[in-house]
Amino acid sequence: MLPAPRAAPVPASVSLLTLNGEAPLVRGLSLVSQAPGEALAWAPRTSCPGENTSSGRKVSPCSLDISDKLFCSACDQVFQNHQEQREHYKLDWHRFNLKQRLKNKPLLSASDFERQSSRGDLSSISGSEDSDSASEEDLLTLDEERAESEKPNRPPGFYPHRVLFRNAQGQFLYAYRCVLGPHQIPPEKAELLLQNLQNGGPRHYVVLMAAAGHFAGAIFQGREVVAHKTFHRYTVRAKRGTAQGLQDAQGRASRSAGANLRRYNEAMLYKDVRDLLAGPTWSKALGEAETILLHAPRSGRSLFFGGQGAPLQRSDFRLWDIPLTTRRPTFGELQRVLHKLTTLQVYDEDPREMVRFHSPETHCKPVREERKRDTEKEKTKVPSDANKALGQDEEPLKQGSESQEEDGSEVELELVELTLGTLDLREFEVLPKRRKKRKKKERSQKQQCGAHGPLLQQPQDEPFSQPTQVVATPLDTLVDEAKAPGQPELWDMLLAACRAGEVEVLKLQLATGPVDPGVMSLLSAPLGSGGFTLLHAAAAAGRGLVVRLLLEAGADPTVHDSRARPPYTVAADRSTRNEFRRFMEKNLDAYDYSKARVPGPLTQEMEARQATRKKEQKAARRQREQQQRKQREQEEQEQEERRRFAALSDREKRALAAERRLAAQLGAPSPPVPDSAVVNAGRCWSCGVSLQGLIPFHYLDFSFCSTRCLRDHRSQAGRPSS
């Protein structure tokens, strides 16, 4: 094996926030052109079969060797130190590329991974399925960004989100474009970028991040944190990683308590973030900020855009997407992102030259022709049945062997045998549980259709044909009798109408003229998944009018599903259950209602009594609330009077009491009091509590509610004389 390449020199790091126009580092700056025509050529590398250098590149079998250098062969990244390398190995991007390499699939760059993960094209490493219906404007923006980032013949060392400068000392500076000014600065006006860099870039930053129920935002004035806030709400389904809103948008809305809690938390998170950003501090900061950095997946962008009073606008030139792979939104992550973006990398040499000379070469080990033939024989030993089960054909193997024969350099990796040894594990990835369920459903439909028609065109060794013919129950007989060549479409139409509450569609099939015998056979047939009938589906969806129509048409409420539940027990609400009771009141002898678990008939007199009782309860509740409101007002008024009386001095209290005694002796009305709150002089001299209904304690001319207040007042009165 050839010697490993030496590591690239570590660039110096300088904070953009500490620079000024007089710093030697920024003197004589000029923008370095990175046009593809002016870029350096790629360094010669040892070619290996299967290598591709495009953005969606395939990993070369020769790049599977292990190196102790500061380089990641899966992501094609060079690191400055071991700490940065360890941090890279924890990223979802690195783990995703590892899985792609094990599956022999194309790898993604950091920018492609960010765009596809935010759009929802990729499931996360933990198994989430994040997808959302984006607007047309967002999709067009993503397409433009993808076309810009996937331009052919991109030179080495070129980064679309970074700008390369050169100073008078011959040093090269890499700076992130998002901290050098707004979008509206065109590329031809390079002097504006140079001026922003020499001035240390913008000083007012607002960084916002949101993902998976987490929100974090901070306002920075240079390095100083002016304000920051984080929120966390439980919005992501456990063991699934899918947000509840995305699950509902896909038409699989759940009615569980956890789903309702997640929907409530999504609404509260939306309200909390909107209220925070609409506050005086944050709204002023968003208006004065020179740069706004944002990171949010496609499903989380509604927190910031759209709707009434949106805090951000998509056309804002100050708004930038964070061009980094981020972790969970926290205050520490916000500080790390801003520190990373405002750090300049200073090189003594041209970084494009460094990429050329320090790019890791592919190390391949030559092998003998005999060993190559043995390996090809092992590949051809895989049986055809196994290849079919794994979704593979023999043609890729033949093409691979022909390409290796045509290649003049006979090279191969030692890990080829390990790759062949793990092919049997891919069977579980190709055939997941969901696909098995679909196959069972398709087989049952094919078998039912085949009972009344010609035999299906299947091979004789079909593994599932024999067991399905052996199992025969009365339920299967009912299904077979109900099924006809056109019945599956009719069943799907009726089921969709029951779930959606389309009463008019059902009336066309049930209420006009004689009912079709095919439709009658489907009314009580448990044909759905889980043994649901049409009555089950309508009751579970809370469609009371549909339930009434089906019962009047002849649907049997005593038919149970696979979990022994009649339609009444799966009803969504009370109004739907009342439809069964109203039907029972009109048709007492039609069915065995104890088997249907209907508790009893519901007459009009019972409904009238219930309505009257509800009105009385509502009136009593309204009266009780009014009394409680008056009592609270009286208590608040008493507390205010007590506080004001206790705040008076002893001289003012004596004067007020003397005026009231004099007015009482003369029989004249009480003199007006300046403060309308102090209207009762019969209060405790110490704490101000009303003495009405109490036996007061006296000493001298003072009255108190308790001996404790008397003792406190006496000690305070005797304190100056002591």
From Swiss-Prot:
Reported EC number(s) for this entry are: 3.1.-.-
Q: Where is the composition biased (Basic residues)?
A: 434-443
Q: Which InterPro entries match?
A: Ankyrin_rpt, Ankyrin_rpt-contain_sf, ANKZ1/VMS1, VATC, VLRF1/Vms1, Znf_C2H2_type
Q: Where is the composition biased (Low complexity)?
A: 119-128
Any one Pfam family here would be VATC
Locate the compositionally biased regions of type Acidic residues.
129-139, 403-412
* Recorded GO MF terms: catalytic activity, acting on a tRNA; RNA endonuclease activity; zinc ion binding
- Coiled coil (UniProt feature): 602-655
Q: What is its main location?
A: cytoplasm
* Biased composition range(s): Polar residues: 457-466
Task: Report the subcellular localization.
Answer: Cytoplasm
Q: Which domain of life is it from?
A: Eukaryota
The Gene Ontology CC terms held by the record are:
cytoplasm
What does the comment on domains in this protein's record state?
A: The VLRF1 domain mediates binding to the 60S ribosomal subunit.
Q: How does it assemble?
A: Interacts (via VIM motif) with VCP.
Q: Which family does it belong to?
A: Belongs to the ANKZF1/VMS1 family.
Instruction: Spell out the protein name for this chain.
Output: tRNA endonuclease ANKZF1
Quote the gene name from the UniProt entry: Ankzf1
